[in-house]
Every structure is written in structure tokens, then in C-alpha cells.
């Protein structure tokens, strides 16, 4: 059965019909003024409740079985990369030095996978670099695992290997009352030093090809795999060897170090080595900062930048 119901709006009577499809529901008419107001309030409250439920459903935390335990959609609970790296190092330190496992193998693998996914360099460190970080954390916590001599020796070894985790910014020493910062190898500029010799080696290679009647070009155009073998196992190694030999003939035992100025932080570069017959036996170079003009001393032995005596920081 269907009934037609007319709902009045306050004192005025609305003429928009509402159909009741329930056969058991009685829709009495006419309504009084008080009943019409009560019914209208109920009708207006229902959509608000539905919208609240929908907003709560949308704002809730999503659940995805593919998300690792260390990656949560909730920003308030998601840990930073630094916190995960610290927990990773603590787990390794506890396992190797204390003989205790603070997490299961599955949790450790999930943490390592998450750090690799985030692009963290901690999980890609060498054994010496991981040992250095563990020793630093253990010293801060009050339980050193290395003596001062072993720690300094390990740090110097990592500096000589070109590790970036031991490079720090400008800082002040309370003991020596000096301001200093660390030096790092500038691999890009050292690579650029080989470019002129490489150009000369390529010129000699094509000159040799020309005077032999393009016999080298004929070998490069041989069918596969002979062309590939000749190119990558004969021609390219010969060019690289010739370029390195020419560079070492002009520059002997060269090293390019870079580091921030202790005064203004501007990065400066210094060259160490012998150019032709001009030797440079000293391990220190006096460098003037290109930013603030501060006089600095670059030490290739300790890989440190210090200010000379009487220098102002």
C-alpha cells in the first residue's frame, strides 16, 4: 500500500508530496504544527550523521598487506630514516658486541629492506664504516667498544679511503682552541685531470688508424663477436692506458682535496702533487678562502683544514 504525505514547513504548508512505501507504516494526516517541526528535525539530522560516518571512514587509516611493518601510512606513527638507521646500528652492535638479539631475523630483514628502499647509505656501508658508526654510538651511550687510539686509527684509515661518513663540518676544539674542518677527495676534478690526456690518446689512435690505411677501422667493423672483443678488450684498454700514462708523466702523485672554510663554509680546493719537474714535498698548502679571504692551512696527512696561528675565525 502507498500513502501520500504532505509535510508542512513551520506555519506554511508544503505541497511537495512524500511517498511512504511501507505497507505496515501508518501515515496519519493531518499533522499538527508541533509534530511537523519534530519530523523536520529528524529528517535534517539524518544526512548529517551519514556524512559524519562517511568522513570518518575516509579519514581512517588504510590497511595494505603489502606495506612493511616499518612503513605506516599514519604520519604520526611513521618513523624517520634517521630513527630506522639508529635502530639498525643498535641491532648490529647488540648482536656482534653484546651477543644479544634485540629483534628477530625477520624484523631485521624488514628493517634493512625498508632502509634500502628509502635510499639509506647505512646498509651499503663497508665493515669499517659500520664499525666506526657503532663505535661512535657506543661512545655516546657511555659504553665505548674501542680505545681512543683504535678509534683515531680507524677514522684516519677511512679518511684515506675517501669515506664521507668521517667528514664533518667546521667545528671548534676546546683543547687546542682551534677551528678546523675535514678534507675530502674531489674525485670529479681528479677525473677532469685525465681529460686532456684522453683527448691526446684518441688523437694518436686515429692518427695510427690513418697511417695504417684504416686497418683499425676494418677491425672495428668485423662481424660480431670479433668487433666487440677487439673494441672492449683491445682498443679501449689501450686508449685508457695511454691516457693514464700521459697524465702520470705530467702529474706525479697528485691529489685534489676539498673542504668547507671554517669561517664562512665556502668550499675550497687545493692541489697536492708534482707538476713536471716542480716538486711539492710538503703535506700542507696555504689556501685563501674565495668567499671571505681567510687564510687556511690544508693538511693532506691529517686531512684537516686549520687556521694558522693568530688567524681569526
Swiss-Prot record:
All ranges on the Stromal side of the membrane: 50-187, 247-313
Disulfide bond positions: 71-172
Keywords: Acetylation, Chloroplast, Disulfide bond, Electron transport, Membrane, Plastid, Thylakoid, Transit peptide, Transmembrane, Transmembrane helix, Transport
GO biological process terms on file: photosynthetic electron transport in photosystem I
Regions of this protein lying in the Lumenal, thylakoid compartment: 209-225
Domain text: The C-terminal loop (247-313) is required for ferredoxin binding.
Quaternary state and interactors: Homodimer and heterodimer with PGR5. Interacts with PGR5, FD2, psaD1, LFNR1 and LFNR2. Also interacts with petC and a Fe-containing cofactor (FCC).
Name the record gives this protein: PGR5-like protein 1B, chloroplastic
Species in which this protein is naturally found: Arabidopsis thaliana
Chain's gene name: PGRL1B
